[in-house]
């Protein structure tokens, strides 16, 4: 099964991706991870992407799509994949569909985790993570046992620059402008599954699991 995981920043995509990966035998493909892998491996596509990334520019769609396509052709994706962080625009979605069609595949389900804007702001502005092991906490909903210290490894807890104040609001605005149209795109294909993400992660996952097992 080929799954797209969608939702605004702070919706809990990372948590659901980990739960899905543990339950279903398909790889979790994060575009951030495969960009880093391509760059570290020194592949031709990775070198092209690095030129843009190092100068602070967005990587063009054709390079991003090619890197994603290269990843989903690997053997561990034969039974499906969970794609997180791509596509972000309808142009990217169309390019992905074309790449999948060339491989005799298609998107089976696009999961959209929907969360009210005010709750997203609270989640993001309270989000901190461990500098060492990258475990994520939330000062409002899931604080560490000891202030400033990771429960898992004792590392220092820090807040990302893009999880602060006005930056959070801007990130959500960009998401709404660029990514919201994707919902209409996948709805037209009959593969969109909207889920209320303001509940606990266990409840959200239970609904996603029920949907996947019904397909």
Swiss-Prot record:
It is an enzyme of class 2 (transferase). The keyword Protease does not apply. SUPFAM superfamilies: P-loop containing nucleoside triphosphate hydrolases. Keywords: ATP-binding, Cytoplasm, Kinase, Metal-binding, Nucleotide biosynthesis, Nucleotide-binding, Transferase, Zinc. AMP binds at residues 31, 36, 57-59, 85-88, 92, 160, 171. Catalyzes the reversible transfer of the terminal phosphate group between ATP and AMP. Plays an important role in cellular energy homeostasis and in adenine nucleotide metabolism. This is Adenylate kinase. It comes from Syntrophomonas wolfei subsp. wolfei (strain DSM 2245B / Goettingen).
């Amino acid at each position: 099964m080929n799954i797209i995981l969608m939702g605004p920043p702070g919706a809990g995509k990372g948590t659901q991706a980990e739960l899905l990966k543990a339950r279903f035998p398909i790889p979790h493909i994060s575009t951030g991870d495969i960009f880093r892998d391509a760059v570290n491996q020194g592949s031709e596509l990775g070198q092209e992407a690095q030129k843009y990334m190092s100068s602070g520019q967005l990587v063009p769609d054709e390079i991003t799509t090619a890197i994603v396509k290269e990843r989903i052709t690997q053997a561990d994706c034969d039974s499906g994949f969970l794609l997180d962080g791509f596509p972000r625009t309808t142009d990217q979605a169309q390019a992905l569909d074309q790449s999948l069609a060339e491989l005799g595949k298609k998107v089976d389900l696009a999961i959209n985790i929907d969360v009210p804007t005010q709750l997203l702001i609270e989640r993001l502005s309270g989000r901190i993570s461990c500098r060492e092991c990258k475990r994520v906490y939330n000062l409002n909903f899931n604080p560490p046992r000891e202030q400033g210290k990771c429960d898992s490894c004792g590392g220092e807890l820090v807040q990302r620059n893009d999880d602060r104040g006005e930056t959070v609001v801007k990130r959500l605005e960009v998401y709404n402008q660029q990514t919201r149209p994707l919902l209409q795109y996948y709805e037209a294909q009959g593969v969109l599954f909207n889920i209320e993400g303001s509940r606990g992660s266990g409840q959200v996952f239970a609904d996603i699991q029920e949907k996947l097992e019904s397909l």
